Each structure stands twice: as C-alpha cells, then as structure tokens.
From Swiss-Prot:
Protein name: LRR receptor-like serine/threonine-protein kinase ERL2
Glycosylation sites: N70, N79, N228, N239, N310, N334, N379, N414, N443, N462, N469, N534, N539, N549
Annotated binding of ATP, by residue: I657, G658, Y659, G660, A661, S662, S663, T664, V665, K679
Residue ranges that the UniProt entry lists as topological domain Cytoplasmic: 607-967
Species of provenance: Arabidopsis thaliana (Mouse-ear cress)
Top-level taxonomy: Eukaryota, Viridiplantae, Streptophyta, Embryophyta, Tracheophyta
Main location: membrane
Topology term for the membrane: Single-pass type I membrane protein
Length: 967
C-alpha cells in the first residue's frame, strides 16, 4: 500500500514537471514565431539579425536585441535601434503581449504603425523615431494605459493628433516632432496632469495656443516651433510656472507679448519668426532664470528696455530682424554671461556703448544694418572671447581701433558699408585666426598693408569700393587658405603679382576697375580652383593665357583693357602684327631659348659631377651649395639622395600625393625597399639651421606605433626634404572628406582611429622627455596604415619644450577650426591646446563633417544642437548604422565637448581621454579587424539598455552639462 502511495506521488510530481514544461514552452513558441514574423517584415537584416534563427537557435531570449523576463521567460523588451533596417513593422508585434519596451529608432522602416500595437497592453516605452513611417497615428495606441514614453519624431506621419492620446493616464513624454501632422492640438491633451515633455515642432498644425496649456502643471518642455499656429499668446501664459523651455517660434502668431509672460520661470523663451508687434515688455528683465531670449524676426517696435541688463544669467540675446528704435542701452554691458548679442537689422541709432567692452564672455556681436554713428569703442578689444564682430551697413566713421590686434579669438570681422576712413591698420594682420575680413564700401585710403599676407587662415578678403592705391601685395601669395579676394573699384596700380599663382584654393579673384597694368601672369593658370576671374577695366596688355582653365571665364571678365588680345576679347594677337615685329619677336624668343638651354646644360654638368653621399647623424659638414642627407634610422641608409631624385624624377608633379599649407608630399617607391613619403617644405632656408636640425633629430628619436617615424631629412637645392613612413590609406581627412574616398568608415574603425591617435598624443604629452606638443592636431595630420592604424604626423613643425614651461608658437599657429581659442588669445601653448584640437577631430569622426565648411563651424553647430536636444541628429549615417550601442556615441560626444571646453583647466589630459576611448572598445577585441565597409559577420554584441542613455532626461542633462561648461 505504501508502495502504491509512493508511486502516486512520483506520478503526481512527474505530471507537475511536464505541466510546467509545457506551460513554459508554449508561450516561448508563440513569441518565437512572432519574432520570426517581425524579422520577415524587415529588409537589410543579413548582417544584423544573424542569430534570429528558429532552426539552429530556439532560445530567442538570447537573440540580439531581445530581452526576456528571468522568471516567465516572456519577451519584455525589444531594442533594434540604429541597425539600418528597412521594410515595415509587422502586425505580429501585437502577439508580444508582455512587451514593456520597444525601440526601433534610427532605421529606415516604412509603412504604417500597425494597429495591433494596442494589444501590447504592458508597453511603457515606445520609440519609433527617425524612420520613414507614414500614415495616421493609430487610435489603438490609446489602449496602452501603462505607456509613459512615446517618441514618433522624424517620420512622415500625417493626419491629426489623435484626441484619444489623452486617455493614456501615465503619458509623460510625447514627441511627435518633424512629421506632417495637421489639424489642431487636442485641447484635452492640456489636461494631462502627468505630461512633462510635449514636442510638436516641424509639423503643419493649425489653430491657436489654447489658454488651457497652463493646465499642464507638470510640463517643463513645450515646443511647437515651425507650425502654422495663429492667434495671440494667451494672457494666461504667466500661469505656466512649470515651463522651463517654451518655444513657439516660426508660426503665424500675432499681437503683443503679454505682460504676464514675465511670471514665467523658463530658461529658454523662443518667440522668433512670428508677427508679434508692440514693445518688448520691461517685465522680461525680471526673468532671472533666462539663459536664452529670442524675440528675433518679428515686428517689434520701440526701444530696447534697459532693464534687460539685469539678466545676469542670460547667455544668448537675439533681438534682430525687428523694427526696434532708440539707442543700444549701456546697461546691456551688465549681462556678465552674455555670449551672443544680435541686434542687427533694426532701426537703432546713436553710438555703440563702450560698456559692451565689459562682456568678457561675448562670442558674437552683430549690430549690422542699423543707423549707428560714431566710432567703434576701443575697449571692444577687451572682449577677449569675441569671435565674430559685424557692423555692416551703418554710418560708423573714424579709424579702425588699433587695439583690435588684441582680439586673438576673432575669426569674422565685417566693417563693410560704413564711412570708415584713414589707412587700413597693419595691426589687422596680427589677428592670426581671421577667416573673413570685409572692409568694403568705406573710405579707406593708402596702400594695402603687407601684413595682411600673414593671415594664413583667411578665407575671404574684401577690400572693394574704397580709395586704396599702391600695388597689390605679392605677400597675398602666402594666403594659402584664401578662397575669395575682392579689391575691385579702387585705385590700385602696378602689376598682378605672379605669387597669386600659388593660391591653390582660390575660387574668386576680383580686380576690376583699378589701374593695374602689365600682363596677365601665366602663373594664374596654376589656380585650378579659380571659377570667377574679373580683371575688367584696368590697363592690362598682352596675350590672355591660352590655357583650358581660362576658357571658363566670360569675355566680360576682360573688357575695358584695350591692349589685351586673345579670342576672349575678340582680338586675335598674332596675324595683325607687322612682319618686322614678328621677326623681332621670333629672334628674341630664339635667343632666350638658346640661353636657357645653355644654362640647363651647365647645371646638369655640375650636378652630375658631384656624387652625393649621406651624412650620418651628428655630422656637421655641409659644403656650400651641396646636398646634406641626414639618416636618423638605419632603414633609411639604403637610400641615397641621387636614388631618391632618380626615382621621383627630381620630384616631378606626377609623384605628388598631397598638399599642405606649408609643404608638398611625394611618394617614392623603390624596387629594393618599401615606399617612403617625402615632405618638401616651402620655407627652404630656416633662419637657424642648427635649431631646425636639432628639432628634426629630436622628432626622429620618437618611436611609437601611433606616430609616423621620421627616418631622415635632406637640405638640398630642391628644398628641405623630410622622409617619413608611407601610409597606404592616406589621411583621416581624405577618408572623411576627400572627393575620391573609396571606403566607408564604420564605427569600430573610427573608434580604432580615435584610440590610436589618442595614444600617440598621450605618448608625446606624458612619456617623452622633454614633453612634446604637436601644435597642429587635425584630421589631415592623422595618417592611416594598411590596417587603419592611426599615426600622428607633421612633427617637422612640432617643438619639444621643458617640463615646466609653455611655448609661444612662432612657426605654425594651427589650423582654422582646430585652434584652441585660449591659445589664439594668449599665444601661449601647452598640452591643453592639443586636447582642444583632438576634441574637434572626435567631432569629425562622429559627424563626418569638416571642422569648418562654408563658414560653418562644426564645434558651434554641435553646441547649438546640444541646446536643442538634437545632438544625435548630427551623427554620420555610417556611424549610426554600424554602432551597436548608441550610448558609446553619446559618451564620445561628451568626451569631445569636454576636450573643447572653453577653460583649458577643465579639459581632461590625453591619458584620461585615451582611457575613456579604450573603455568603449569591445572586450574581448575581435580577432580580425573588419573592413571599414561592413561589420564583421557573426560578431555578437550585447547592447546596453540603461535608461541613462535612452531617456530624454539624459539629453537634458547632456545639454545642461555642455551649456554650463562650454558656453
């Protein structure tokens, strides 16, 4: 009997086990089928969802992006963000009944949001942003009573905002920005007591701003920018005391700004781009929490209230594009944290108040297109951080303050269309970071200062419509970055300098309406980027160079020069000459050619008679007129100078592989050795040979896997030549921005490049004795070998410095877009200057954009996007598609902006930077580096799912951190 009882017990236990197994297997199978149906509706899944395989891997809880409950084994979270997935969202999504979170952002999913999503009643988090979804927002979403976060921004959704969204009791974040939604904002939405974030910008919404908007007692973010809202700002706006960001800009809102707006406690108030009228309420001056006040592009009238000077925490004040009158209040000089002041395009009168010189953090001052008179106050030069100064289109007079030479951070100076007079100060040539100088439309006289040729970062130079005389400086040939030169409508004489032929980046050369004479230099045909040439109405003579790149210019470019001849001006040069002149010209040409031939033969004979021998390191013998070849590493000893010249055919142009601001780079390939890169420096004779050689020997002693080795150098009649390792994949600049880029850089490769460059720079800063500062970190100075290992280059211009000192640069001052503003202001150099530049390189790697492009500054763009919570929109598509963890991208953005903090003391060291980047490298590292074009197949990564990198609160904190530290 006892045995029977025992057997019954065993059968009961066995039955319970079977029941539990069946109970657990069944839902797994159902959810597994749902996941496979979801996969089937996607495209571009080949390399992304390899482990989603119900044949070889039944454990779907281990599939990529799938997270299950530890007890029930039900799918509770699905994260397939930023995988470049196409196709549609399957209706099988509704079969995942226990789903609590789904993130499909950053893909290319089309189609409609399936109604079946309403079956996932446990959903608390939904992010379908940045896809190609279209159609209406399904009403079934209102069934999701647990939903707290709904992000559908950056799609193509149409139709109205469903009023049923108001039935979701726990909804805290609703972001529908940048779609094509129409209709009005449902009034019931304003009665959701828990709603904290409402983003509706960039749609086609109509209606008015409801007085009920202030019923949202928990709302801190209200953004309806860029819609078609009409009506007025409700008087009850002052009751919206929970608002921190209020943006109703770029709508059709009319009327006056209500007085009650002064009761708000917002940090950002954006009303720009509407049709607001009336005066600026003085009560705004009492809004002490304001960091950004933007009332621009309206129809506001009256004076600027002096009480705005009380806004001591405001960093940005935009009042441009209105009809404001009166004078600029001196009280604005009390806004101690002001970085941006834009008062342009108004009707302001009077003088520029000297009190503005107290704004030590001022970055941009724009007073253009007003009716200002008088002088520019000299103490504007006290604004040490000033980067852009624009007073175009006023009635200012007098001379340009000589103190402007102290504005080391200034990159944009526009004094055009005023009544300035006197000579152009030579001191302007000391503002080393200028990229735009516009003095056109004034009464400047005298000659053009030769010092302007020292502005090596200058992109635009406009001196037109003045009373300048003298000649066009030959020093303009040093403006290696220049794109536009306009000196038209002056009284310039002399000839066109042949040195202008050195300007490889020039796009427009405008010299018309002067008194320039002589011939058009043939050297201008070397300016291959030249697209606009105007030399009309001068006294030029001779033949227009018959080169192909001159055929692009219209005949009008040459009109008004009666002694010019050529097909372009309808005057054929040759046939009209008398026979005697033809004979004389032929005779002269023959004699000149004969003389040149004789000189060449003598030179060749002398050159052949001298056998060049390498000089070992340390030797000081250097015969006059001979070549000195210095070997720094023995692997260079197999080369002789004659060999190098023979292989490169005396540095023929066809061996050129790159240009720099101060050098040309050639490739030398020998059958008996590996290729080397030859850098030919423009400045052939440094002032101190011994110092020059000592620096090169110091640099040549550096051996590190992330630093390009200097193997030797030569002082020769061909110039000063430096011999480096040849890097197969060129520079990072070439791969990111070059016109012929052949590979795509995935995130893993970019991270590898960043780590390598950081380790190389950390070695220079911390492991060299004396320590070494690079001074010109930029993407074009980060070279890549065949395995995309980064190596820092251009150490021919670096300097070693004592461990307790900093060094003020006298050779190279960096490159525009990468220059540390503090270095530009003080000319004092330390490691923090390199760290700033490295931060810009990180931004290039993340965004794929140039540091400076068409006057747009990458760093400023990212800071602006940080203010708007849109930083991640700047990420390069090749990064977002191949990075498995978007948190790594965000951390790298943070690191880049820490490196570029305005205060150098707040920047990390390169050792710290290197450690952070290394922490982002997958562990253990893959055995084989994937090609840059694709992610290694079969590689498995677990994706971070922490709330600190996925919630909007992270973006808010990110914005606040950056705003506090960088603005």
């Amino acid at each position: 009997m006892r045995r029977i009882e025992t057997m019954k017990g065993l059968f009961f236990c066995l039955g319970m086990v079977v029941f539990m197994l069946l109970g657990s297997v069944s839902p797994m199978n159902n959810e597994g089928k749902a996941l496979m149906a979801i996969k089937a509706s996607f495209s571009n899944v080949a390399n992304m969802l390899l482990d989603w395989d119900d044949v070889h891997n039944h454990d779907f809880c281990s599939w990529r992006g799938v997270f299950c409950d530890n007890v029930s084994l039900n799918v509770v979270s699905l994260n397939l963000s930023n995988l470049n997935l196409g196709g549609e969202i399957s209706s099988a999504l509704g079969d995942l009944m226990n789903l609590q979170s789904i993130d499909l952002q950053g893909n290319k999913l089309g189609g409609q949001i399936p109604d079946e999503i309403g079956n996932c009643v446990s959903l608390a988090y939904v992010d379908f942003s940045t896809n190609l979804l279209f159609g209406d927002i399904p009403f079934s979403i209102s069934k999701l009573k647990q939903l707290e976060f709904l992000n559908l921004k950056n799609n193509q959704l149409t139709g109205p905002i469903p009023a049923t969204l108001t039935q979701i009791p726990n909804l805290k974040t609703l972001d529908l920005a940048r779609n094509q939604l129409t209709g009005e904002i449902p009034r019931l939405l304003y009665w959701n007591e828990v709603l904290q974030y409402l983003g509706l910008r960039g749609n086609m919404l109509t209606g008015t701003l409801s007085p009920d908007m202030c019923q949202l007692t928990g709302l801190w973010y209200f953004d309806v920018r860029g819609n078609n809202l009409t009506g007025t700002i409700p008087e009850s706006i002052g009751n919206c005391t929970s608002f921190e960001i209020l943006d109703v800009s770029y709508n059709q809102i009319t009327g006056v700004i209500p007085y009650n707006i002064g009761f708000l406690q917002v940090a950002t108030l954006s009303l720009q781009g509407n049709k607001l009228t009336g005066r600026i309420p003085e009560v705004i001056g009492l809004m002490q929490a304001l960091a950004v006040l933007d009332l621009s592009d309206n129809e506001l009238t009256g004076p600027i209230p002096p009480i705005l000077g009380n806004l001591s925490f405001t960093g940005k004040l935009y009042l441009h594009g209105n009809k404001l009158t009166g004078q600029i209040p001196p009280e604005l000089g009390n806004m101690s944290r002001l970085s941006y002041l834009q008062l342009n395009d108004n009707e302001l009168v009077g003088k520029i108040p000297p009190e503005l010189g107290k704004l030590e953090q001022l970055f941009e001052l724009n007073l253009a297109n007003n009716n200002l008179v008088g002088l520019i106050p000299s103490n504007i030069s006290s604004c040490a951080a000033l980067n852009q100064f624009n007073v175009h289109g006023n009635f200012l007079s007098g001379a340009v303050p000589l103190e402007f030479r102290n504005l080391g951070s200034l990159t944009y100076l526009n004094l055009s269309s005023n009544s300035f007079k006197g000579k152009i100060p030579a001191e302007l040539g000391h503002i080393i970071n200028l990229d735009t100088l516009d003095l056109s439309g004034n009464n400047f006289s005298g000659s053009i200062p030769l010092t302007l040729g020292d502005l090596e970062h200058l992109l635009i130079l406009n001196l037109s419509r003045n009373h300048l005389n003298g000649t066009l400086p030959a020093e303009f040939g040093n403006l290696r970055s220049i794109q536009i030169i306009d000196v038209s409508f002056n009284f310039l004489a002399g000839v066109i300098p042949t040195e202008l032929g050195q300007l490889q980046n020039i796009n427009s050369l405008i010299l018309n309406n002067n008194k320039i004479h002589g011939k058009i230099p043939d050297q201008l045909t070397n300016c291959f980027s030249l697209a606009n040439l105007n030399i009309s109405f001068n006294n030029l003579s001779g033949i227009i160079p018959p080169m192909k790149n001159f055929t692009r210019f219209s005949p009008a470019s040459f009109f008004g020069n009666p002694f010019l001849c050529g097909n372009w001006v309808g005057s054929i040069c040759g046939p009209s000459l008398p026979k005697s002149q033809v004979f004389t010209r032929v005779a002269v040409i023959c004699m000149v050619l004969g003389f040149i031939t004789l000189i060449c033969m003598i030179f060749i004979a002398v050159y052949k008679s001298k056998q060049q021998k390498p000089v070992l390191k340390g030797s000081s013998k250097q015969p006059e007129g001979s070549t000195k070849l210095v070997i720094l590493h023995m692997d260079m000893a197999i080369h002789t100078f004659d060999d190098i010249m023979r292989v490169t055919e005396n540095l023929d142009e066809k061996y050129i592989i790159g240009y720099g601001a101060s050098s040309t780079v050639y490739k030398c390939t020998s059958k008996t050795s590996r290729p080397i890169a030859i850098k030919r420096i423009y400045n052939q004779y440094p002032s101190n040979f011994r110092e020059f050689e000592t620096e090169l020997e110091t640099i040549g002693s550096i051996r590190h896997r992330n630093i390009v080795s200097l193997h030797g150098y030569a002082l020769s009649p061909f110039g000063n030549l430096l011999f480096y390792d040849y890097m197969e994949n060129g520079s990072l600049w070439d791969l990111l921005h070059g016109p012929g880029k052949k590979v795509k850089l995935d995130w893993e490769t970019r991270l590898k490049i960043a780590v390598g460059a950081a380790q190389g720079l950390a070695y220079l800063h911390h492991d060299c004795t004396p320590r070494i500062i690079h001074r010109d970190i930029k993407s074009s100075n980060i070279l890549l070998d065949g395995n995309f290992e980064a190596r820092l280059s251009d150490f021919g211009i670096a300097k070693s410095i004592p461990a307790t000192k900093t060094y003020a640069s006298t050779y190279v001052l960096g490159t525009i877009g990468y220059i540390d503003p503090e270095y530009a202001r003080t000319s004092r150099l330390n490691e923090k200057s390199d760290i700033y530049s490295f931060g810009i390189v990180l931004l290039e790697l993340l965004t794929g954009k140039k540091a400076v492009d068409n006057e747009a500054n990458l760093h400023q763009m990212i800071l602006s996007k940080a203010d708007d919570n849109t930083v991640m929109e700047a990420v390069d598509a090749e990064v977002s598609v191949t990075c498995m963890d978007s948190g790594h991208i965000k951390k790298t953005f943070q690191l880049a902006l820490l490196c570029t903090k305005r205060n150098p003391l707040e920047r990390p060291t390169m050792q710290e930077v290197s450690r952070v980047l290394l922490s982002l490298v997958p562990s253990p590292p893959p055995k084989k580096l994937p090609s840059p074009a694709k992610v290694q197949e079969g590689e498995e990564r677990r994706e971070s799912h922490s709330s600190d990198t996925t919630t909007p609160q992270w973006f808010v904190q990110f914005r606040e951190d950056i705003s506090k530290s960088s603005l």
